[in-house]
């Protein structure tokens, strides 16, 4: 083996450039809002849509489950207590589409609609 051949073997290999450029993480999309018909607006006393299914109590300020599309509470939130009140007092007495209102009973008309 000649000196030239041995020198060629000892040369370091050329530096390789990375094939793939590092990708930036994809931006996280904000959660899509549900349709207005299925939202509850505690301050305005809006109705719950049948798709939402209700099921929330007054402590969380959500919907009542009344026939699958109950009402939302329009009055201010009550102070949390260790005692849980029955949800029926905050829900409409009729399923969605009825004429009764929320707000402590079907006789009061200060709450949301069904």
Curated annotation (Swiss-Prot):
GO terms for cellular component: cornified envelope; cytoplasm; perinuclear region of cytoplasm. One of its GO terms (molecular function) is identical protein binding. Residues 75-86 have a biased composition (Basic residues). It comes from the Eukaryota. Precursors of the cornified envelope of the stratum corneum. Belongs to the LCE cluster present on 1q21. This is Late cornified envelope protein 1D. It comes from Homo sapiens. The lineage of its organism: Eukaryota, Metazoa, Chordata, Craniata, Vertebrata.
